[in-house]
């Protein structure tokens, strides 16, 4: 882990100190590199964005992004937890200190995936696309009410948790403040929005645009969710405009004249009927969805639906709920844009502090808007005057001007007058609480102790989330099947779902060790050892009959020691064998010739013992358990043993001479231990089975058999010699 962290530091210069671990690259944002990491203070995985400060322009963009994201607080916007300096240090309140740093880190909410990754698996169902589009419009309504333009909406900047299908807008690196009271013509940056999601107005006039550019991008994203591919994918700006003109009608004559001045080659006399309308580009789309999309993808920004109007469209009626679509309580104004300009001058940069950007210090009554100019001389955005003309009615949140607004909320016993209205995560202590306050409590839906939160607290406790549809979560399987299977998290809080990463890793390792121990304990057959022993046996020479008997006796003794066969059978066999061999040993005191002439009584005893051994072997074969040695030897070609027929003692010798080594089929077979003793031709040097058996009776072979004592073999060899 330490080596991996050092490599990330060396390659990317990503240094957060020892507080963050398990860094993994996620991608690049609008102006920085993004990693995921685990915060050791609360065991929670977060996303960390690094912004490099190399020149005054980068400092201005970083300050603008930090200023915007710290004030925005909405369910469909990625939450920001804190801003850190190099090595994870805390930033001071002085904004001027930002110019002295080489980088800053934005610690924000970690999301499972983004819409671009989801669309790589194919198009979405229309129900899923409508749900995601509703949440996108819900977030845009809040962003635009704060007088902010995102300017970089695309699937890669829309983050999704597939468990609950929550979509959140992220990456405000290219966002900017735009007060609708003033015209920003000629003062806006150009070429910011990704080319495929640029509106026609942005292509014609890169320095003059409004909030409508975000709505055009939202419409292109909605069409991409339905088809799985980019709606207008031009290789350059001219081709991008050509693709738009082939599908989007140009209704107004002034727009056609403007196009005629810029690109006269592609302009026709009648452009109200496009060659490839949206019905051809989006086959199979419902009529309601097509009407909804046609009102968003309009050539003129004045005809385009706003976010609030799109939420009221009949296509969104199943999700629309105006009470649960909040707007910003503290929108940005022109003074916040002036701050960006003043920050470029070092003589003014140290007089502005961070506290200025937490809450706006000036209202519209305090700010001298028209001190030096008449009302008619001030240029305004035409979209701001489309519906209303009164200056105060343009303000989005009318509650800002109500008298006694704060005092009526102090009557709530749950409201503590000594509690600061600032977000709790601004302070270095109580660091662990910032995640729970933003993720687990009911206050995460709105800004803490704001008027919108207090008004909606009662009905939010009783109402379910109206746009949450479990059936859609079940249907979203094409992405889930290709992602790793997750553990069941039903019944857990969000902290338990998102936190305790180290504890989960330790639990998984402990469970794996427990499974391995149980596997070793319950192991009944070691396949590896079986293969090794089988190979070893195959490399040895072919065992003789006596070796087979010794191995068989060894296997029987092992089975007996493990309790796999009954001890009474083995004991009975051993007692009979010892008794017969004891009688045989008593007869060995006489000469070999006398033993042979005595009507074969000793041979009969030995044959009887061998027959009993064969019967025991037959019992072992019928047993359910068979060792791999028994199976190995059973494959050898062994002649079938014959049971001795009861004959008279006088005829025993002659019968043994003719039939002791013959089976029913006439094949010669060997007694596994001592039947060769009864052969009268043992003195013959050629073809004598006695000599072959005598050669195999080595001391090692005798000692390997636990059933027959070594003393008996010694006495037999003595007489044989």
Swiss-Prot record:
Modified residues (Phosphothreonine): 626
Cofactor(s) annotated in UniProt: Mg(2+)
Residues at the catalytic site: 152
Record EC number: 2.7.11.24
InterPro entries assigned to the protein according to its UniProt record, in alphabetical order: Kinase-like_dom_sf (IPR011009), MAP_kinase (IPR050117), MAPK_ERK3/4 (IPR008350), Prot_kinase_dom (IPR000719), Protein_kinase_ATP_BS (IPR017441), Ser/Thr_kinase_AS (IPR008271)
Coiled-coil region(s): none
Keywords, ordered alphabetically: ATP-binding, Cell cycle, Kinase, Nucleotide-binding, Phosphoprotein, Serine/threonine-protein kinase, Transferase
Binding site for ATP: 26-34, 49
Alphabetized GO MF terms: ATP binding; MAP kinase activity; protein heterodimerization activity; protein kinase binding; protein serine kinase activity; protein serine/threonine kinase activity
Gene Ontology BP terms: intracellular signal transduction; positive regulation of dendritic spine development
Modified sites of kind Phosphotyrosine: 628
Regulation: Activated by threonine and tyrosine phosphorylation.
Reactions mediated catalytically: L-seryl-[protein] + ATP = O-phospho-L-seryl-[protein] + ADP + H(+); L-threonyl-[protein] + ATP = O-phospho-L-threonyl-[protein] + ADP + H(+)
Processing and modification events after translation: Dually phosphorylated on Thr-626 and Tyr-628, which activates the enzyme.
Start and end residues of each Protein kinase domain: 20-316
Annotated motif TXY, positions: 626-628
Highest taxon listed in the record's lineage: Eukaryota
Family listed: Belongs to the protein kinase superfamily. CMGC Ser/Thr protein kinase family. MAP kinase subfamily.
Domain notes: The TXY motif contains the threonine and tyrosine residues whose phosphorylation activates the MAP kinases.
Name this protein carries in UniProt: Mitogen-activated protein kinase 6
Organism, as annotated: Gallus gallus
Organism taxonomic ancestry: Eukaryota, Metazoa, Chordata, Craniata, Vertebrata
This protein's encoding gene: MAPK6
């Amino acid at each position: 882990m330490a080596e991996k962290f050092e490599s990330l530091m060396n390659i990317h210069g990503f240094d957060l100190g020892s507080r963050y671990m398990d860094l993994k690259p996620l991608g690049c944002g609008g102006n920085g590199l993004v990693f995921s990491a685990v915060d050791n203070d609360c065991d929670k995985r977060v996303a960390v964005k690094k912004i490099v400060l190399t020149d005054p322009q980068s400092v201005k963009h970083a300050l603008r992004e930090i200023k915007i994201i710290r004030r925005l607080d909405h369910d469909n916007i990625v939450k920001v937890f804190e801003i850190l300096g190099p090595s994870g240090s805390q930033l001071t309140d002085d904004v001027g200190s930002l110019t002295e740093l080489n980088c800053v880190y934005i610690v924000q909410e970690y999301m499972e995936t983004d819409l671009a990754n989801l669309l790589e698996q194919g198009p979405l169902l229309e129900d899923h696309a409508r749900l995601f589009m509703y949440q996108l419009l819900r977030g845009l309504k809040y962003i635009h009410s704060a007088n902010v333009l995102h300017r970089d909406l695309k699937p890669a900047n829309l983050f999704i948790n597939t468990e609950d299908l929550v979509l959140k807008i992220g990456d405000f690196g290219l966002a900017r403040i735009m007060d609708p009271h003033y015209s920003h013509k000629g003062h806006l940056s150009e070429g910011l929005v990704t080319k495929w999601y640029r509106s026609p107005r942005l292509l014609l006039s890169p320095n003059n645009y409004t909030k409508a550019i975000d709505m055009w991008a939202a419409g292109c994203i909605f069409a991409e969710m339905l088809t799985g591919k980019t709606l207008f994918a031009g290789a350059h700006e001219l081709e991008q405009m050509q693709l738009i003109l082939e599908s989007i009608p140009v209704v107004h004559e002034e727009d056609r004249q403007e196009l005629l001045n810029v690109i006269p080659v592609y302009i026709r006399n009648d452009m109200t009927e496009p060659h490839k309308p949206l019905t051809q580009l989006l086959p199979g789309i419902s009529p309601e969805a097509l009407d909804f999309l046609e009102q968003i993808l309009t050539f003129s920004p004045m005809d385009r639906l706003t976010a609030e109007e799109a939420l009221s469209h009949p296509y969104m009626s199943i999700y629309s709920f105006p009470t649960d679509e909040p707007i910003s309580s503290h929108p940005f104004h022109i003074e916040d844009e002036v701050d960006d300009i003043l920050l470029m001058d070092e003589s003014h940069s140290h007089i502005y502090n961070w506290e200025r950007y937490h809450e706006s210090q000036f209202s519209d009554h305090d700010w001298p808007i028209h001190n030096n100019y008449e009302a008619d001389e001030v240029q305004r955005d035409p979209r701001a005057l489309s519906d209303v003309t009164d200056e105060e009615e343009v303000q989005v949140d009318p509650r800002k001007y109500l008298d006694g607004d704060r005092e009526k909320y102090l009557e709530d016993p749950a409201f503590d007058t000594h509690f600061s209205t600032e977000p709790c995560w601004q302070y270095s202590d109580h660091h662990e609480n910032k995640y729970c306050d933003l993720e687990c409590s009911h206050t995460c839906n709105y800004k803490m102790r704001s008027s919108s939160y207090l008004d909606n607290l009662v009905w939010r406790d009783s109402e379910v989330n109206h746009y949450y549809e479990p059936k859609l979560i079940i249907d979203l399987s094409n992405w889930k099947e290709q992602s790793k299977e997750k553990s069941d998290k039903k019944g857990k809080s969000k902290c338990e779902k998102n936190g305790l990463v180290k504890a989960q890793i330790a639990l998984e390792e402990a469970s794996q060790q427990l499974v391995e121990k149980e596997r070793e304990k319950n192991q009944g057959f070691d396949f590896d050892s079986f293969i090794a022993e089988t190979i070893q046996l195959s490399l040895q020479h072919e065992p003789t009959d006596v070796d087979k008997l010794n191995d068989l006796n060894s296997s029987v003794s092992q089975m007996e020691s493990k309790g796999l066969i009954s001890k009474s059978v083995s004991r009975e066999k051993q007692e009979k064998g010892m008794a017969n061999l004891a009688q045989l040993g008593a007869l060995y005191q006489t000469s070999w010739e006398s033993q042979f002439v005595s009507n074969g009584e000793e041979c009969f005893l030995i044959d009887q013992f061998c027959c009993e051994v064969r019967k025991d072997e037959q019992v072992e074969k019928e047993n359910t358990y068979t060792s791999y040695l028994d199976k190995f030897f059973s494959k050898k070609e062994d002649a079938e043993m014959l049971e001795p027929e009861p004959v008279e003692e006088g005829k025993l010798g002659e019968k043994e001479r003719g039939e002791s080594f013959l089976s029913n089929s006439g094949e010669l077979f060997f007694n596994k231990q001592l039947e060769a003793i009864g052969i009268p031709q043992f003195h013959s040097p050629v073809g004598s089975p006695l000599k072959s058996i005598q050669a195999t009776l080595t001391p090692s072979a005798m000692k390997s058999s636990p059933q027959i004592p070594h003393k008996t073999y010694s006495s037999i060899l003595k007489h044989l010699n």
